[in-house]
Amino acid sequence: MRLIPLANASDVGKWSAHYIVSKINAFNPTAEHPFILGLPTGSTPLATYKELIALHKAGKVSFKYVVTFNMDEYVGITENHPQSYHHFMHQNFLDHIDIPKENINLLNGNASDVETECQRYEDKIKSYGQIHLFMGGVGNDGHIAFNEPASSLTSRTRIKTLTVETRTANSRFFDNDINQVPKYALTVGVGTLMDAEEIMILATGLNKAQAIQAAIEGNVNHMWTISCLQMHPKSIIVCDEPATMELKVKTVKYFHQLEADIIGEFASKK
């Protein structure tokens, strides 16, 4: 596992965006051989999406031959609802780049048969072989996508009941009214995520510090979903300084030294 400890949330957004662009460009995708990118929603990746849009407009990257799969979607709200993840993705990213509509994949939270919808999504991912890079965020309790604490570490795309903690955290998007937050969501599973060639998790803020400590210094534990990254051959956590506050000083120092060249190169370009 790699940890890229940066100064602030803005740096996390810029570094992760440039990393994605470097991966896409190195892959040199074509219509027959597209780059498969997994994407999250939430407040943490907004800075990444903003930088990706800027890099696209500057001619640094094209998404014409990129296929995206989003992590999750609420059950029971329409796609055009202002808090649906369909709406979020189009408003904050997809409508501002050159990705073809047919290359965009999001779960349908209003499907009449959610089990069939989840299997369709799994099958669609498998039809491309694997996701090359899956970017995600992490919840205060260590959840990735909507894989809440105690989720099976081999789980596949499915419907999940959202915890009170998650619904409370997300209520800020629903007029601070938890009763407006859906109780269920469709989500890729931990096993689905682990099938990706590479996983990059973004974490910003002191409220994510305990989850980052569990991911890096703790044991693999289904109560901390993020700890599954320890079992992945190519996982990376990109975080700001506040998110490292629960880590041992020597742990942070170790990763600063390990990634010194990369962090230094980034700082020189700011």
UniProtKB/Swiss-Prot annotation:
Checking InterPro entries in the record gives: Glc/Gal-6P_isomerase (IPR006148), Glucosamine6P_isomerase (IPR004547), Glucosamine6P_isomerase_CS (IPR018321), NagB/RpiA_transferase-like (IPR037171)
Keywords, sorted A to Z: Allosteric enzyme, Carbohydrate metabolism, Hydrolase
Q: Which pathway?
A: Amino-sugar metabolism; N-acetylneuraminate degradation; D-fructose 6-phosphate from N-acetylneuraminate: step 5/5
Report the top EC class in one word: hydrolase
Q: Which reaction does it catalyse?
A: alpha-D-glucosamine 6-phosphate + H2O = beta-D-fructose 6-phosphate + NH4(+)
Q: Where is this site: Part of the allosteric site?
A: 151, 158, 160-161, 254
GO biological process, alphabetically ordered:
carbohydrate metabolic process; glucosamine catabolic process; N-acetylglucosamine catabolic process; N-acetylneuraminate catabolic process
Q: Does the keyword Glycoprotein apply?
A: no
- Function according to Swiss-Prot or TrEMBL: Catalyzes the reversible isomerization-deamination of glucosamine 6-phosphate (GlcN6P) to form fructose 6-phosphate (Fru6P) and ammonium ion.
| PANTHER family to which the protein is assigned, alphabetical | GLUCOSAMINE-6-PHOSPHATE ISOMERASE
UniProt protein name: Glucosamine-6-phosphate deaminase
Q: Which organism is it from?
A: Photorhabdus laumondii subsp. laumondii (strain DSM 15139 / CIP 105565 / TT01)
